[in-house]
């Protein structure tokens, strides 16, 4: 895409239209990627049954959500028996025995957090990019890095307390009155900063991921357009650029993902047993403990499952988002012409 066309697109696509495009992309990404994680959780629960109070991470392709296992026998979706022999076998048996809707078990509650976070993130990124381009010039290579960092930092900061509250409601079955009491008590005892517990490892993972993702995405998209002799990227160019840049960022930030998951799980283990969280459980201490116990490779455990989840999620999200913006841009041009 040439600079002039890119500049026109930013001007002609309104923030509301960017929000609609990102919302559509978020929902579509969740619908396509969630079944992969549902099957993974069902297979894990079959091999290692989840007792009450046990934490597990559920992903809808946009965000990771910590869930706390409840009592309920075989009624709960992640505890249903299946006798699965593998991933494909699990897909077919879940559809045949439980209905195709079971592949999206647990999705609606997670969208309450994921969709607003994604809308904030993508809209802020585009708005910041447009602002920086107007100040620094169209070809400034640091723009995707700066915009990606600021947008992700803001989205994580806004959503972090809401995610803590959502998980507490899910694990303790609080009413809104009880939730208000819990939040008030927590703030009075530990201060407002306690609502952002778990924020640091999330920022350490998501902010570098965002910077690397957007920088590589813009570079790859431009390079593929030049190789194809195109001024504007096609759907497949956006899709490929998103998958490759997402995969690279996922590998580079995996150690922080491992730490974040472990810290979340430990937090709720302490919470469920009503034990005070040790003050020394910082991100760096957890990382050192992982290396001491499992070696340096322990920081890269779960690489393949993360890539299987991240690559398609990034590809679907960005290509849908760019397609939506292109659609709105054409509609805006037509309105100006008539």
Swiss-Prot record:
The keyword Transport belongs to this UniProt entry's keyword annotation: yes
Coiled-coil parts of chain: none
Pfam families from the UniProt entry: Mito_carr
Bilayer topology term: Multi-pass membrane protein
Solcar repeats: 13-131, 139-223, 233-327
The reaction(s) this protein catalyses: glutathione(in) = glutathione(out)
UniProt superkingdom: Eukaryota
Keyword line: Membrane, Mitochondrion, Mitochondrion inner membrane, Repeat, Transmembrane, Transmembrane helix, Transport
Record field: transmembrane: 19-39, 103-123, 142-162, 199-220, 239-259, 298-318
Protein name: Mitochondrial glutathione transporter SLC25A40
UniProt organism field: Homo sapiens (Human)
This protein's encoding gene: SLC25A40
